[in-house]
């Protein structure tokens, strides 16, 4: 049984010039323990597909039709409140360019702490300890120091590792 199944997904955006069909009939599945690479030209809908799965579309974007079955639930029908519990806890995405996903005004620790505080009820001190553990898990050298840094102070590869740690959190 697939962990994630996308059936005939259609994601559209309302614009002043009309409707833009960003994702038009995409279907695929991912089995537990397997990896799926989504490849396509720039502007072909890869990122919009991922944003649709996580329900992170801009205000003018919407899922017009299709199903996003994750762990037996159709995420297309899940409320915003329930999706906040699922997103970052049960399902995550690691974006290609981490600098656009990390907030430049917050430290790595602050950003990585959020899932532990929100989803696991940890206090800030407990979450800070867990952040260092996560940074160690993705083989970031000197994780205590890196946790106190801002994204712009890290190399692209280090930012990517931070995003992997965030997805695993």
Stretches with model-predicted labels:
Residues 1-169:
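ABC transporter nucleotide-binding domains
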């Amino acid at each position: 049984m697939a962990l994630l199944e996308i059936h005939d997904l259609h994601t559209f955006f309302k614009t002043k010039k009309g409707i833009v069909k960003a994702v038009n009939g995409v279907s695929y599945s991912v089995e537990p323990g397997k990896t799926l690479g989504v490849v396509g030209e720039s502007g072909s809908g890869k990122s919009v597909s991922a944003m649709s799965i996580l329900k992170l579309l801009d205000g003018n974007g919407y899922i017009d039709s299709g199903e996003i079955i994750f762990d037996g639930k159709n995420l297309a029908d899940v409320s915003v409140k329930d999706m906040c519990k699922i997103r970052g806890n049960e399902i995550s995405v690691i974006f290609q360019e981490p600098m656009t996903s990390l907030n430049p005004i917050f430290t790595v620790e602050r950003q990585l702490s959020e899932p532990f505080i929100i989803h696991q009820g940890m206090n800030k001190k407990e979450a800070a300890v867990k952040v260092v553990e996560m940074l160690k898990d993705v083989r970031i050298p000197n994780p205590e120091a890196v946790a106190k840094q801002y994204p712009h102070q890290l190399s692209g590869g280090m930012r990517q590792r931070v995003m992997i740690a965030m997805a695993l959190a």
